[in-house]
C-alpha cells in the first residue's frame, strides 16, 4: 500500500477520538521520516498530533557499557521495553481532564535518552510512535502491540536498506569499514528479527 492510501484509510477514524499509531520496520526503513510526514498531514488537517519515538527508551550508554552491551546497541534487550509499554498505556488511557504525559527522546549528539522531552497533551488525537520492535512477539515487547490501535510496517529492498545504514553510520563518524561491519552485523541481525514480525502489521507500506 502507498503511504498516502494508508493515511486516507486512517483519517476518518480520528474523528471518533484518539488513535495510537505504530510505525515499524527494519533499521533504515524510513520510520522517522514517515512518522513526521503523517504528523504533518494530521496537523494540516486540523488534528492535534505528536510523535513519540521508541528510541527514547534506549538504556543509558553507561548501562550498556557496564553490561558490555555497547557493541549491540539497538538490539531488543538494550531498550526499556516495559517502560515503553507503560508509557503507551498511559497515553492510550489519557483523559481530557488529565495532565500532560511526558515522554523521553533520544539525543544522537549525546548517544543517550533525555527524560521528559516530549509533551503528550490531553487534546492530542493522533499519537504516532515509531521503532523497530513494535510488533516483536516476545516478552516484554508483546505488551507494546496491545497498546496500538493500528501498526504500519515499512518495507524496502534489502540492498537499499543496507546502503542507507552504511551511509548513516558514516554520517555518525564511523569509518567506511566500521560502517559496513555494523550494517552487515548487528543491524542485519536486528533487521531479520523485525522482518519476522511483519505478518502482525495492519498495513504494509512499500517504502521509497
Segments from the language model and where they lie:
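ATP-dependent NMP and nucleoside kinases share a basic, alpha-helical "lid"
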Residues: 110-168
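Hydrophobic positions on the alpha1 helix immediately C-terminal to the Walker A/P-loop
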Residues: 34
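Extreme N-terminal, non-catalytic leader segments
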Residues: 1-22, 26
Amino acid at each position: 500500500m502507498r503511504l498516502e492510501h494508508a493515511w486516507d484509510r486512517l483519517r476518518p477514524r480520528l474523528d471518533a477520538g484518539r488513535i495510537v499509531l505504530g510505525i515499524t520496520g527494519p533499521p533504515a526503513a524510513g520510520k522517522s521520516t514517515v512518522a513526521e510526514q503523517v504528523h504533518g498531514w494530521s496537523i494540516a488537517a486540523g488534528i492535534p498530533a505528536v510523535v513519540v519515538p521508541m528510541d527514547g527508551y534506549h538504556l543509558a550508554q553507561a548501562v550498556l557499557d557496564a553490561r558490555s552491551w555497547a557493541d549491540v546497541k539497538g538490539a531488543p534487550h538494550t531498550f526499556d521495553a516495559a517502560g515503553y509499554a507503560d508509557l503507551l498505556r498511559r497515553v492510550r488511557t489519557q483523559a481530557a481532564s488529565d495532565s500532560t504525559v511526558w515522554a523521553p527522546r533520544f539525543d544522537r549528539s549525546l548517544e543517550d535518552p533525555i527524560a521528559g522531552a516530549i509533551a503528550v497533551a490531553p487534546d492530542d488525537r493522533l499519537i504516532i510512535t515509531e521503532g523497530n520492535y513494535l510488533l516483536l512477539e516476545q516478552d516484554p515487547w508483546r505488551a507494546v502491540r496491545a497498546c496500538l490501535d493500528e501498526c504500519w510496517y515499512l518495507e524496502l529492498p534489502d540492498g537499499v536498506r543496507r546502503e542507507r545504514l552504511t551511509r548513516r553510520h558514516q554520517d555518525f563518524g564511523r569509518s567506511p569499514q566500521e560502517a559496513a561491519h555494523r550494517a552487515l552485523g548487528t543491524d542485519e541481525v536486528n533487521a531479520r528479527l523485525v522482518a519476522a514480525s511483519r505478518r502482525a502489521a495492519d498495513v504494509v507500506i512499500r517504502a521509497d
